[in-house]
């Protein structure tokens, strides 16, 4: 059966994001993925030493100064017969709620682990978010050109800490100065390592068969024997790859390599296009929308301010769920009920914007936005429904914000509410006093907010520390119990930017005790937009 041209386009799409701890090599992998997809011919070392060459996926003034990717940019590139959309996720200590929300807009994730360090804190947090939708995960063990931990130990750690089974696809031969290549368990082939730096992809020498004498000649008898011994262990002790379990988010195929040395990234990409799902169906408040439907639907998962320093515009990033976008099409913004003609949607190659004529499910569009679009907004061709699963996440860091000029309270509140609608930060107004508390997931969000308040709203603000450890959105089906809860905890209650009631806890101990005391009240870590 031949698929219609529309369904062929849908079937070609793969949309994924990379999750990792800072410095596990995410930006390098991003560049090498684009290199193998021929999207950029020179993958510049990320912080070009002494040169002004910036990595392709870093932008905005602050990013330029710090050499980090604050903004979740989007890159599209062809690979084999597929079109791959890679959503970049801010990686440093400077990551934000955008990073979490971006994971709600993809169909698959690549987890990058520094093989010298293993599972680290940020990776754990990001994996928790992927669990909200059981997103399929591929794993790349990076930095094999350095001395790494025992590979079996790494697999055990992923399984135990992240509660996902590991199915090794390739297996390393040596590491550091002795790194010789990887063996592919399912193709019975060894790929020999020759370092390719920058944008040179070396021709890889392949040795067929595990017992081929050429293998001993190429890597040395000791390493060849060690490989055979390890593989016996691996095949006995680890999971076989099973596509169904992968799609259910229960096992992860594991690849080994070095992104810096341009080695192993293509094996992972081959796996990604072969196994990662084409655009998936998504839930709305009324029904499930399939990617095969021809009527257009999409949702906004992120709003980016000021991508163009010359203009103060904002761009809303929209994930296409179904249907084909065509230039000049009329779409309904469900929240406002208004119909808008969209003739200037953008597609991105990180920072280079170009206007797009058409887009399909899995693609990401940039919509110009002058403050009228919010995170979580659904666009359709008229159907009144709202996509679910684009949450706010409970902040982990809090500051009180204070004005240098107290007469500008009105501008401050307006600025903060707009910034919170964009997802730059969350705002809480305690019920019992006139404080304004801002909450964030990453420290850099605080700097961004003060800088933007000054440049966009002409408001100078400073931060003070505040006695808040965490926040939870509260609700209850029992009105009487809820009233009692509100009465007795007034000093810990606040309203967020959307006027939702929030419990702000001074300590985790306080939160746990309060939850025990009020079993009829729900304390939520996430809130739907």
Swiss-Prot record:
GO terms for molecular function: GTP binding; GTPase activity; guanosine tetraphosphate binding; translation release factor activity, codon nonspecific; translation release factor activity, codon specific. Signal peptide: none annotated. The keyword Nucleotide-binding applies. It comes from the Bacteria. Disulfide bonds: none annotated. InterPro entries: EF-G-like_DII, EFG_III/V, G_TR_CS, P-loop_NTPase, PrfC, RF3_C, RF3_dom_3_sf, RF3_GTP-bd. Keywords: Cytoplasm, GTP-binding, Nucleotide-binding, Protein biosynthesis. Its main location: cytoplasm. Pfam families: EF-G_D2, GTP_EFTU, RF3_C. It is found in: Cytoplasm. Residues 11-280 form the tr-type G domain. GO terms for cellular component: cytosol. GTP binds at residues 20-27, 88-92, 142-145. One of its GO terms (biological process) is regulation of translational termination. Belongs to the TRAFAC class translation factor GTPase superfamily. Classic translation factor GTPase family. PrfC subfamily. NCBIfam families: prfC, PRK00741.1, small_GTP. Increases the formation of ribosomal termination complexes and stimulates activities of RF-1 and RF-2. It binds guanine nucleotides and has strong preference for UGA stop codons. It may interact directly with the ribosome. The stimulation of RF-1 and RF-2 is significantly reduced by GTP and GDP, but not by GMP. This is Peptide chain release factor 3.
